[in-house]
Amino acid sequence: MKGGTMVENAQYLDASASAPGSTTPLETAWIRVREKLKSEVGEVEYRTWLRQIVLGPLEEDELTLYLPTRFLRDWVRSQYEERLQTLWRTEREDIKGVELQVKRGLPEVSMGDAEDGEDGSGEGHELATQAAAPESRSDLAVPLDPRFTFDTFIVGKPNEFAYACARRVAEKPSSPGFNPLFLYGGVGLGKTHLMHAIGTELTRTGKVSVAYMSAEKFMYRFIAAIRSQSTMEFKEQLRSVDVLMIDDLQFLIGKDNTQEEFFHTFNALVDAGRQIIVSADKSPSDLSGLEDRLRTRLGCGMVADIHATTFELRISILEAKAKASGTHVPSKVLEYLAHKITTNVRELEGALNRLIAHADLVGRPVTLDTTQDVLKDMLKAHDRRVTIEEIQRKVSEHWNIRLTDMSSARRARAVARPRQVAMYLAKQLTSRSLPEIGRKFGNRDHTTVMHAVNRVTELMDQDTSFAEDVELLRRMLEG
C-alpha cells in the first residue's frame, strides 16, 4: 500500500524476456505493448533503444517504466514517450500516465558510449553482440527542409553578414577563408534556416552530396555505430560527403568521446577539401567545455554572428509571412507583434501562423483585440512595472525618431507629438508625479506635462488613427 492506495504488481518484468507461465494482467498488457512497439518501429530499432525497458509498479493511475541509464531514459523519453503513453492508455483505461525513471542495477545491454558519467554507464562499455544494423547514408543525415531557402530568408542588418557568407559557401564551397563556416547566435534567429538554404542550393545540381544533422543526432548515430560494431562504416559515410553541416554544436559540450570523433571527422573532411558548416549559440572561443584543439579548428575559417533582430527586421519578416499566407493582417497588428516578441523569430512566426489559422477557421478578420485574445498565453503580462525609459524607447521606435529627442528642445511636430504621447503614457501607466515625469523629459515643468496629457486626450477624441496608435502603444507596454 502507498498512501492508502493499492500498488499493483511491483515485480519487474524484463522487456526482453518472454512471458512467464503465469503473468499478472499488468504483465500481460506490457507484453502486448512491447509487441505493438516492435511492429511499429522494427526489430532493429526496438533492440537498439527499447529492449531494455523494465516494467515497474502501477501506483494509482500512473505506471512506472525503468531504464538502466539516464542516457537511455532521456532518449526514450524524447523519441518514444508519447507513443508509450498512447499504447498503455489503449491497453488499460485505468492508466492515465507513464513515468520513465532510471533504476540502477538493472541488466544493461551494452550502452557503449553513453556520454554520461552520472548514470553509471560511463564511456567504453563492452559492445553489444546483438545490435542495430549499420545505417545507410540516407538514414545518417536529416532531410533538408524545402521551406528554408535563400529566397525565404529575410535579410536585415543583424543577419546580412551571415547571409552573405552562406551565399558565398553555397556558390563556392571550400573557398579559402570560408572553411569551416561557423554561424552563431541566439535561438530562433535563422542559423538553421541558412544551413538548410546552403544545402538546398548545393544539391540542386545533383553533383554535390550534403549531410545535415544536429550535433545531438551525430552523437546518437555515433553511439549506435559503436553498439553495432560498425564505426568504420559510420566514419566512411560521413567522410564521403562533399558538405557536412552540424547544427547546435554546443550539445557536444562535455561529450568527450563524441568530440573526439567529430574532431577527426572535421580534420579528414577539411584535409580532403570538403566543406564543413557548423552552428552554435556562441562563438568558438566562448564554447567552454569544448576541447581547445576543436575550438581552435572551428575558429580558423569564417565566423559569422547573427545578431538579435531589430524592430524593422521583425516587421519585414512578418510582412513577408503575412503576404505569403494570403490573409490580410493589419499593419498595427504586425507592429504589435514586432514590439512584443523580440528575441525569437521562430516564436514570432509561430504567433503569426496561429493568428492566421484562427482567422481562417472562425471566419473573422485579424484585429488587435483578437490578437490579444488568441495569443494571450504568449503575450501574458509579466509581473513588472512599466518605466518611463521603456515608454520613451517604444514611442521613439514607433514614430522613428531618436531617443534623445524625448529630452531635447526640438519643437517640430514630428518630434513634439511623439514626446507628448510619451508623457501621456507615462502619466497613465506609471505612478510618477507630473514633476518627476517632466524631469525625465529634459527637466520640463509639470505644467508642460499636464498640457501634453490634455492635448493627447483631445487628439484621441478627434483623430481615430492617432487614437489607434496610442492604444497600440499602451497595449504593448502593458503586456
UniProtKB/Swiss-Prot annotation:
Residues 106-137 are annotated as: Disordered. Keywords: ATP-binding, Cytoplasm, DNA replication, DNA-binding, Lipid-binding, Nucleotide-binding. SUPFAM superfamilies: P-loop containing nucleoside triphosphate hydrolases, TrpR-like. ATP binds at G188, G190, K191, T192. GO terms for cellular component: cytoplasm; plasma membrane. It is found in: Cytoplasm. InterPro entries: AAA+_ATPase (IPR003593), Chromosome_initiator_DnaA (IPR001957), Chromosome_initiator_DnaA-like (IPR020591), Chromosome_initiator_DnaA_CS (IPR018312), DnaA_C (IPR013159), DnaA_dom (IPR013317), DnaA_N_dom (IPR024633), DnaA_N_sf (IPR038454). Its main location: cytoplasm. Residues 1-94 are annotated as: Domain I, interacts with DnaA modulators. It comes from the Bacteria. CDD domains: AAA, Bac_DnaA_C. One of its GO terms (molecular function) is lipid binding. Residues 143-359 are annotated as: Domain III, AAA+ region. GO terms for biological process: DNA replication initiation; regulation of DNA replication. Signal peptide: none annotated. Coiled coil: none annotated. Residues 360-479 are annotated as: Domain IV, binds dsDNA. SMART domains: AAA (SM00382), Bac_DnaA_C (SM00760). Residues 94-142 are annotated as: Domain II. Domain I is involved in oligomerization and binding regulators, domain II is flexibile and of varying length in different bacteria, domain III forms the AAA+ region, while domain IV binds dsDNA. Oligomerizes as a right-handed, spiral filament on DNA at oriC. Belongs to the DnaA family. Plays an essential role in the initiation and regulation of chromosomal replication. ATP-DnaA binds to the origin of replication (oriC) to initiate formation of the DNA replication initiation complex once per cell cycle. Binds the DnaA box (a 9 base pair repeat at the origin) and separates the double-stranded (ds)DNA. Forms a right-handed helical filament on oriC DNA; dsDNA binds to the exterior of the filament while single-stranded (ss)DNA is stabiized in the filament's interior. This is Chromosomal replication initiator protein DnaA.
